[in-house]
Amino acid sequence: MTQDKPSCLLTCEVLWDCFPDRELLGGATLNVAYHLHQLETRSILLSSVGRDRLGELALRQIRDEWGCDTRFIRTLDDAPTGTVTVTLDDRGEPSYEVGTPAAWDQIDIPAEAAAMRPEAFVFGSVALRSGHNRRSFADFLESYDGLRCFDANLRPPHNSVEMVLEWARRADFLKMNGEELDVLGRAAGCGDGDPESKLNALAGMSGVNTICVTRAEEPAVMLWQGAVFHGETFPVEVVDAVGGGDAFFASMIDSLLHPPFDPAGALRRATALGSWVVSRRGAQPPYDGSQPR
């Protein structure tokens, strides 16, 4: 796009985490969109919501509170806005029930969005659970020549290793966590090696030359053009672990879209932002000046 800020087209699972006492807007790629918008990249969202109360609330928050571009979020009459019902047991341990079907199972990529020529396209494996989305994303990727960013989430019951590897081959930049690296590394023929060996095996199988792995308390690692970089940790008091990896992913995308790319610096910046997010309540904390720069 011809504008100062690079733009990013994101396919988002717009959903609500429904707790017994509250409802929180979420979805991994939606969280990425929020953080990109707060950084130096314009977020253009692709999704669907239902014609219901939660759909109206989601659009209002994304558009009016976050300031993101929602023109390509459709409102459907035949499917509800996505939800995840969170139930807490006697010990406070959560269990989750993902609503199916949901409006975000029907994400279209209209010609108007493609014509905007966004510098990056972000998609995640969770949204690939529906055939509609798989067809829509595949059709778009056939002719898209920008940066393709794929978030590999192996979340039961949508945790097909074969499908994740298939879609990883369409990406330029792949993000996952340490557990997912173990699983995908094993599928790539490196089950017992160190992270470097698993990254190289996965790159060899998928053809992706930029892979980032978040590892909770351990430093993140990144493969970039054949070299492996190790991050550092930023000790914080964890208030809410949800969304830290999404902020990390957003920061890495932002760095890739603002050349020249410094892999070590980008890894440090992304780790610092993810650490800051988990020290706050919620996956989309306000950027109030306390965030790392």
Feature-to-residue mapping (PLM):
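Ribokinase/PfkB-type carbohydrate-kinase core domain
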Residues: 1-9, 70-71, 90-228, 261, ...
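Active-site beta-alpha turn of Rossmann-fold NAD(P)-dependent dehydrogenases/reductases
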Residues: 12
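Substrate-binding N-lobe of the ribokinase-like
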Residues: 8, 17-84, 88-93, 98-104
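Conserved post-catalytic alpha-helical subdomain immediately downstream of the catalytic base
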Residues: 6, 17, 38, 207-210, ...
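Residues at secondary-structure transition points
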Residues: 23-27, 53, 193, 239, ...
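Short, basic and Ser/Thr-rich N-terminal targeting/leader segments
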Residues: 79-82, 216, 271
